[in-house]
């Protein structure tokens, strides 16, 4: 009987350990990567993107700073209450020449603070948690009344993407990008008005996969991040 209890206990411990490792495998990977980059700079970017469907196609918007079509969305903002913790984690705002606006969660830090930063981001404290701001800003060009857009749109969370840390040739440093993906259900009558503007484009899933759109006889680039809304 005692042997049976011990065996069951061992099995339970092994099962629990295996389950814990499985569910925290990404976290363990990031922890290991942070050790390898302990004193190296890492760029951090935390954003949210919207999956907006219309007749089995996906709505993209023309980039403001890069000549491409990309998902509606943008970067989260942090609040003043984050400043003390920001200093402790040696977080530095990105230069304005790299698309940074005041309060953007586009920062850089040392690898040793990486896990702590992700813990903070996942806690949703000291930062923007609503996602309506970027939807309103991105839809401004369509001249849809804001109150109508807010009242008629249903938004639901789909998933979170934490990209593997990789070297950015543009920023000349390693970077970690985090994307929260949301589905925005916008009535067709509103989308009909939105599509009157050349700033918006409907694309097929295969065009997103190819990162290329044919428009007026020309090939137009589709952002790599668009794949996350398929």
From Swiss-Prot:
Quote the function comment for this protein: Effector protein of a CBASS antivirus system. CBASS (cyclic oligonucleotide-based antiphage signaling system) provides immunity against bacteriophages. The CD-NTase protein synthesizes cyclic nucleotides in response to infection; these serve as specific second messenger signals. The signals activate a diverse range of effectors, leading to bacterial cell death and thus abortive phage infection. Causes cell death in response to 3',3'-cGAMP upon coexpression in E.coli with V.cholerae DncV; inactivating DncV prevents cell death.
Q: What is this protein called?
A: CD-NTase-associated protein 16
Q: Which UniProt keywords apply?
A: Antiviral defense, Nucleotide-binding
Q: Write out the ranges of the annotated region (Required for cell toxicity).
A: 1-31
Give the organism, scientific name. Answer: Streptococcus mutans serotype c (strain NN2025)
Asked if the Swiss-Prot or TrEMBL record annotates the protein with the keyword Magnesium, the reply is: no
Free-text note on domains in this protein's UniProt record: Cell toxicity relies on the N-terminal domain; its replacement by a SUMO domain prevents cell death in cells also expressing DncV from V.cholerae.
Q: Cross-referenced InterPro entries, in alphabetical order?
A: Cap16_NUDIX (IPR040829)
One of the record's GO molecular function terms = nucleotide binding
The entry assigns this protein to a family as follows:
Belongs to the CBASS Cap16 membrane effector family.
Supply one GO BP term. defense response to virus
Judging by the UniProt lineage, the source's domain of life is Bacteria
């Amino acid at each position: 009987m005692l042997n049976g209890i011990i065996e069951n206990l061992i099995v339970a411990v092994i099962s629990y350990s295996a389950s814990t490792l499985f569910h925290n495998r990404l976290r363990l990977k990031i922890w290991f990567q942070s050790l390898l980059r302990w004193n190296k700079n890492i760029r951090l970017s935390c954003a949210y993107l919207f999956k907006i469907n219309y007749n089995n196609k996906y709505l993209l918007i023309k980039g403001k700073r890069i000549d491409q079509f990309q998902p509606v969305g943008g970067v989260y903002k942090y609040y003043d209450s984050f400043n003390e913790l920001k200093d402790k984690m040696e977080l530095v705002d990105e230069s304005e020449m790299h698309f940074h606006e005041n309060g953007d969660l586009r920062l850089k830090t040392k690898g040793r603070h990486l896990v702590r930063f992700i813990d903070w981001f996942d806690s949703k404290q000291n930062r923007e948690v609503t996602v309506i701001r970027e939807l309103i800003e991105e839809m401004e060009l369509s001249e849809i009344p804001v109150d109508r857009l807010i009242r008629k749109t249903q938004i639901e969370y789909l998933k979170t993407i934490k990209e593997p840390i990789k070297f950015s040739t543009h920023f000349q440093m390693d970077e970690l990008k985090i994307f929260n993906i949301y589905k925005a259900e916008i009535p067709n009558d509103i989308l009909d008005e939105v599509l009157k503007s050349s700033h918006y484009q409907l694309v097929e899933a295969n065009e997103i996969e190819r990162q290329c759109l044919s428009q007026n006889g020309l090939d137009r680039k589709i952002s790599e991040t668009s794949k996350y809304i398929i």
